[in-house]
Amino acid sequence: NTALTYHGYSSFYLAVSQTDTSLSQGYLDEAVNCMRLALFSAKKSLVPQLQYMLGKAYFYKNTVTSFYYADLALKYLSLAKANGYKANDIPEYMGLSYAALGKPMESISSFTEALLLRESDSLLISIAEQYYKVGQTSAAKQYLYRIKKESSDELLVLRAMGLLGAIYTDEKNFSDAKAEFEEILRKNKNSADAYYGLGVLYEKQGDMVKARSEWRKALKLQVNHSGALSKLSEYAK
């Protein structure tokens, strides 16, 4: 049992260190198989840690494969937590898993718990996105302002600006929305999402010529951009 446990753990850590997705998948499969077998005969005191590691393994499987494992990640992380296992990253992993399952309220609850334990810019953007999904834009904006003002992670700042642009567009605050999207494009001229956002802005203003133009720009940069494809298909009818 000890050999299975350690082999499972080492396979997990090898998986998350890989840059090759197919190699990562293989190591994760090995990790899950070993840990599930180890659970059958594990000492009671070791069960919560195995559940925690198994939950994390399923979480990472959910990110590197086309199949969904977020429900299994939640199952084992919840069991580990209920059985008294202490790890500061459990609430964040649970929040991300709830988000993957389309359960924003549960996700917000877990992210809020995570913030009390360990604050990070990635956590702030995650909770802002979930607040946006449930229509609580005032709460979302507070987190996004903080990221814009304080974060040194340029990619997260651009993500925050994009979400602010979408919120401003929804609020019909078109000048501020346009400013966000244009600032993104000044920093990254290849942002398909920013062109898509500008297209939605022009759509709301009733300028469909400009809207289509922006969506086409988005597709030039990202041929499978779901939002731009959907909009152009909608207006092609």
Where do the protein language model's features map onto the residues?
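Alpha-helical adaptor scaffolds
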Residues: I125-S138, Q142-R186
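Helix-start (N-cap) detector for alpha-helical repeat units in TPR-like alpha-solenoids
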Residues: N1-T2, S45-P48, A87-D89, D121-L123, ...
